[in-house]
């Protein structure tokens, strides 16, 4: 699909950058000759807009080998960022898709500035082409045919091999994010814990990773009482899924991802209201993020060791379901007083974190649609983060900045630890109250990470979008897939 050329050929469409300061760039001047001065007129009349994310279409009317030019407004160069580039290109690719373009090119060098080189632009362009044109996988009987972009050519004076490599990496990042989106969007009667495990196994086998899927009996032997408690009310068997990627000869410096895999959450006996239950098929967004990251890792083969652990079940009501006031024993040996069965994700993750440590994780990053509290605190565009290790958090933060997936650190104070340790009957309680809800959930998980360097990512607000946006439709976003993969790719770099 991707090609790199030094010069422009014949294409249905060509994407060109347009900065406010460069209305008379060398390319625009050259193209204006073919248009006999009319392009400059369009600029002067402001029919070609330089505003951020503005897309202006110009038909060549046979004056060049290109059918249509799509000028992408980027505003002023001084305020140009990768986030602006992603959004603008996302909108451009959506426009091309709506026009059913199958052969397009991008004048890569027109997007290059002192801040962004051609490799950065190539990576983002290939990534965003996939993200921006993603469509919901529906179960409708009347499905419309989709016209795909079949050929995409980067026109640049830069080294062809380096640009090809950047296009490949960007494409893989976009595709894996879309894989995660599709998982999150799947209905819960289709994506059970068993089906999620089957998906993970297929992924592991495709990329020659080791894997384990623990069944209920094995979990009982290992004492995974927290995950098993959440599963008590279900007819669907639980799964503890582990994918193991060995990128080094020695099994050292192992990065452990733990993704919450609650395939549907009714709240249990702490039952959600009707309006709060719809959409809870997405409560396995953390698991999807981890699997998406492992897809990228499997494809690109970084020289790192990575474990992905997914504790998976649904959380439903029945005569056998766990109840408020229950006291359960986690795999770590720590006992937990259940005050809220709708705080089940942290219970599943507690055993997931302990199991990841057992498998050899030296660093832990958990990802979960964990609390509504993080949405109240940070909204729908920023992931909440907590940590016991600033050095590890800084690496996660840098990866998130590279991928434009915003995260913000929340605190853990000793008084927060005292609140989750406050129980007359057990070592911990799973829900100290609504105050500081997101912080309480993260603090609880920190009790199981213990001294292992750990970062918690609460994607409850960022995992899904209520409306269409520049990088995709309403629904799952694939939040943190690219950040996790970038963390692994950059891990340990100075």
Curated annotation (Swiss-Prot):
NCBIfam families the record matches: PRK00913.1-2, PRK00913.1-4, PRK00913.3-5
Segments traversing the membrane: none
CDD domains assigned to the protein according to its UniProt record, in alphabetical order: Peptidase_M17 (cd00433)
Major subcellular location class: cytoplasm
Note accompanying the cofactor annotation: Binds 2 manganese ions per subunit.
Keywords of this entry: Aminopeptidase, Cytoplasm, Hydrolase, Manganese, Metal-binding, Protease
One Pfam family recorded for the sequence: Peptidase_M17_N
Organism taxonomic ancestry: Bacteria, Bacillati, Bacillota, Bacilli, Bacillales
Cofactor(s) the protein needs: Mn(2+)
Chain positions recorded as Mn(2+) 2 binding sites: 260, 265, 283, 344
Binding site for Mn(2+) 1: 265, 342, 344
EC number: 3.4.11.1, 3.4.11.10
Keyword Manganese attached: yes
Catalytic activity: Release of an N-terminal amino acid, Xaa-|-Yaa-, in which Xaa is preferably Leu, but may be other amino acids including Pro although not Arg or Lys, and Yaa may be Pro. Amino acid amides and methyl esters are also readily hydrolyzed, but rates on arylamides are exceedingly low; Release of an N-terminal amino acid, preferentially leucine, but not glutamic or aspartic acids
Similarity-based family: Belongs to the peptidase M17 family.
A GO biological process held by the record: proteolysis
Active site per UniProt: 272, 346
Family annotation (PROSITE patterns): CYTOSOL_AP (PS00631)
GO molecular function: manganese ion binding; metalloaminopeptidase activity
InterPro entries: Leucine_aapep/pepB, Macro_dom-like, Peptidase_M17_C, Peptidase_M17_leu_NH2_pept, Peptidase_M17_N
Name of this protein: Probable cytosol aminopeptidase
Localization terms from the record: Cytoplasm
């Amino acid at each position: 699909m991707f090609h790199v050329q030094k010069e422009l050929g014949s294409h249905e469409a060509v994407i060109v950058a347009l900065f406010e300061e460069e209305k008379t760039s060398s390319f625009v001047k050259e193209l204006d000759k073919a248009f006999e001065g009319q392009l400059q007129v369009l600029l002067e009349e402001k029919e070609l807009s330089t505003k951020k994310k503005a897309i202006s279409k110009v038909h060549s009317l046979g004056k060049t080998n290109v059918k249509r030019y799509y000028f992408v407004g980027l505003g002023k160069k001084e305020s140009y960022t990768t986030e602006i580039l992603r959004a603008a290109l996302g909108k451009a690719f959506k426009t091309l898709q709506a026009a059913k373009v199958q052969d397009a090119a991008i004048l890569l060098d027109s997007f290059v500035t002192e801040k962004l080189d051609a490799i950065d632009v190539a990576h983002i362009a290939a990534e965003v082409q996939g993200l921006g044109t993603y469509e919901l996988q529906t179960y409708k009987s009347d499905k419309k045919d989709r016209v795909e972009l079949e050929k995409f050519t980067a026109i640049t004076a830069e080294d062809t091999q380096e640009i090809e490599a950047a296009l490949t990496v960007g494409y893989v990042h976009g595709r894996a994010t879309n894989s995660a989106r599709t998982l999150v969007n799947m209905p819960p009667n289709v994506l059970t814990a068993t089906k999620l495990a089957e998906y993970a196994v297929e992924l592991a086998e495709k990329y020659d990773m080791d894997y384990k899927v623990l069944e209920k009996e094995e979990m009982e032997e290992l004492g995974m009482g927290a995950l098993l408690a959440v599963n008590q009310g279900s007819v669907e068997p639980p799964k503890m899924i582990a994918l193991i990627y060995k990128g080094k000869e020695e099994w050292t410096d192992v990065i452990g991802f733990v993704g919450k895999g609650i395939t549907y959450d009714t709240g249990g006996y702490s039952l959600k209201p009707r309006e709060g239950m719809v959409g809870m098929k997405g409560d396995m967004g953390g698991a999807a993020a981890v699997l998406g990251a492992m897809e990228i890792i499997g494809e690109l083969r970084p020289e790192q060791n990575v474990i992905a652990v997914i504790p998976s079940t649904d959380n439903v009501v029945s005569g056998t379901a766990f109840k408020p006031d229950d006291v359960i024993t986690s795999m770590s040996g720590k006992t937990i007083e259940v005050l809220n069965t709708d705080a089940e994700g942290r219970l599943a993750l507690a055993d997931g974190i302990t199991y990841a440590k057992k498998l050899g994780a030296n660093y832990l990053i958990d990802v979960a649609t964990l609390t509504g509290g993080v949405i109240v605190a940070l909204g729908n565009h920023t992931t909440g983060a907590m940590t016991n290790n600033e050095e590890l958090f800084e690496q996660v933060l840098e990866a998130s900045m590279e991928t434009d997936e915003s995260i913000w650190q929340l605190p853990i104070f000793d008084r927060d630890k005292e609140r989750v340790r406050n129980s007359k009957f057990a070592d911990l309680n799973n829900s100290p109250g609504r105050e500081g809800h997101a912080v309480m959930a993260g603090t609880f998980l920190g009790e199981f990470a213990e001294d292992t360097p750990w970062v918690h990512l609460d994607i409850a607000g960022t995992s899904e979008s209520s409306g269409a946006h520049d990088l995709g439709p309403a629904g799952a976003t694939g939040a943190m897939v690219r950040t996790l993969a970038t963390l692994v790719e950059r891990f340990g770099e100075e």
